Amino acid sequence: MPALADENIFAYSYGSETLPKGASEAYVWITDRRDKNLGEYNAQDYQLEVEHGLDDNFQGSLYLTFQSNHIKGLSPELGDIDRNFAFNGANGSLKWALSSPYTSPIGVAVYLEPGFARYNAKSGERQTKLFLESKLLLQKNFMDDKLVLVGNITAEQEFEHEGGGEWESELELEGSTGLAYNIAPGLHLGGELRYTAAYENFPNEFHRSDYALFAGPAVHYTTRRWWATLSYQQQVAGGPDVRSRNLNLADYTRQEVRLKLGYNF
């Protein structure tokens, strides 16, 4: 069974396909992030999403996000946090498919997602964040659509402040790729590679303040209406934190696990 329109074969990387006009999809994301260089750190990100095909090559989505944080001894400047499933924010997105990998040499889509968040994803501290995420999505299918290769380039401009402080700006750049093979009807096995970096005080400055590289396996299973995707990501390189032997465990975690469950209707 080849990949279906807008099927989430990967947990972090997106394909270029959209839902058909009038089709809808509901799904939940659960991401578990653990292990930093100091103290105890585990955080869970939750996302509830409804997606709808507005046209055969254009879709829209609405999201609600929630967050749990259990942090102790992370930094002398930060207090301990014990938070369970708190409302974090809301996002909306639009995705426009310019070409399909099933009818063209390569599938191309563009994606825009504005939103806001109430908690800092790295520290768990209370904040106000506004952001606009943009993506270029590429997809190439091989071997009668059984082998799927995707690539994403993402830029997210953020504006945030904590308490009564001044607004600060940051640019996050990410590049990711995923490769998966349809080994049996409805079952894809593959892996993902993801590079992410932050540029503080952008656009006034363009200087990379931190980065990390993650890699790991992904498995996807789909039926006529239900599907599930599970991915494990291990940090394999990072900087500029020199205390963790070429890993950046001050700004990012050592490992992430993401589960996505979806229903088509």
What do these predicted regions represent?
Residues 4-263:
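Transmembrane beta-barrel domains of Gram-negative outer membranes and organellar outer membranes
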